[in-house]
Amino acid sequence: LVVIGVIAALAVLVLLFFRAPKVDHKIKYGRNIVAIVLIWVIGMGAINLGIASGLINKKFGNLRDSYFKYGFAYCFTNSVLNTGIQKPKNYSASSIKKIVDEEESQATEATEKTPNIIFLQLESFFDLNNMTNIKLSDNPVPNFEKIYNEYPSGYLTVPVVGAGTVNTEFEIMTGMNLDDFGSGELPFKTVLTNHTSESICYNLKEYGYKCHAIHNNTATFYGRNKVFSNLGYDTFSSIETMNITEFTPTGWAKDKFLKDEILDTLDLTTEQDFIYAISVQGHGAYSVDDSYESKIKVTGLDDESLTREYEYYADQTREMDKFIGSLVKALKKRKEETILVMYGDHLPSLGITAENLKNKNVYQTQYVIWSNFDNDYYKNKKVKAYQLESRILKPLKMTAGVINNYTQFHRKDSDYKENLKNLAYDMLYGDNYASGEENPYVATDLQLGIHPARLTNIQQVYEDDVIDGFFYGENFNTYSKVYINDEEMETDFIDNNTLMVRDCNIKYGDKVVVCQQDADGVILTQTDEFTYSEDEIKPPNYTPPETKKAKATKKSKKSKKSKKNKEAETTSK
């Protein structure tokens, strides 16, 4: 979009050069150049002075607030020009070798205990009981509070407020500090679109894990369908592969459907599993109309509209909490040892300020480490998002990965952050000195969904000179669309095994596929190509659902038959 905008701006300038009125006096180029230079120097000087004095921030944890505070020109320019990690002054083969040598001296063998590991990232999840300026008619998160108080837990420092989920995601998955990147940058939209990176997935693969991502929102949001391949995931189950039937009043999928997705994924493999589940129910905005009836009442706010937003949000966290309780209950019953790490990705966009929080920090959410087996691996403590992976893996003696290893053993060193920046630069923008000058991470062949759709059979039903096509297979849902000879058909979802295309005259030799595509029509995956032939028959013992037209026709025929019978009876009498 930035490139398109720049091209459009240049095109307009060129057009104006030729079409705009010409001045009738001599232009004083020297004076104008001096003025431009002075404006540039004064402007940059003022910005640098503001940054040095702390009046202007180079980092945008809250993009919306930053644009309001510092203005569009500064924020937009900074976001466009300041991307990636600036090359550290001391970056060299020898400096990286020194860091790597330090970490290798700390490497240990992995323990025999390799539990399933689940990271549950809860969208905008926050315990409203931690606010000092409001009162609630009921506790919206009793399950979370109980687990939080009984298991290792603490505050999680995240890089964003109110939005920017993928930046918390990025730090947790890679172990890299977002402060080292450009202002407001989303690495999911920049470097990770075409570059692999060390991640918790690649690190756990060293111990035999299969790695899965689950998200009850569209796969293309933040480009996850591309990025997750570069982060080492084997499967990615998005809303386009799920059968979600309930949504919030603002249109987000409810989180309770994640439970079965998580359990099914654990059942899928014989290996140990790592699952990164990303919820969406708590997503903003929280504006609802006056007809919304809240279950939890909020008092203490002067603004009626804001109060309604808080009440709506409280209701959503209440439902998310029920999902947490049901998931924990289900995991307790499983024989496989499992660690479940739960946390909010950032505070909700409700205008929350530090002074109204018990912990006085808008960049902190809460996390808890639950497990279904006895262990003493973890203690209550605060942790930064980019150190969470190492906090979970260190007690398990899983030291694979340059960044993971370095954080495990050097996070308290005085030069830790600088060396971490060096390692991240080396891996994403440098010469890969840490890994023998080669990128060791190969992008995975990411499978969309754990149960891909499959087309097995086609049947045509003739009805009143109209031919309806029935397409049979497995794992269909409302995002499944029939394509015939590369042309999308208007598709009706009947059930998980059946799709229907009305008025569809398929000819012998036609090529048919079923595609899973998002709401914008982006094709995410498709079945193997199916060539229609005379041998195709309907599945045994299967009666296709009646269409409304068929039912109406039957009713009409039945009515006519009944009328004829009555006429016959009258005549006989």
Regions found by a protein language model. Name each.
Residues I117-Q121:
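Long, solvent-exposed extracytoplasmic domains/loops
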Residues L1-P115, L136-Y155, T190-N194, E198, ...:
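N-terminal secretory/membrane-targeting segments
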Residues D101-E112, L122, D127-K573:
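Solvent-exposed soluble domains appended to multi-pass membrane proteins
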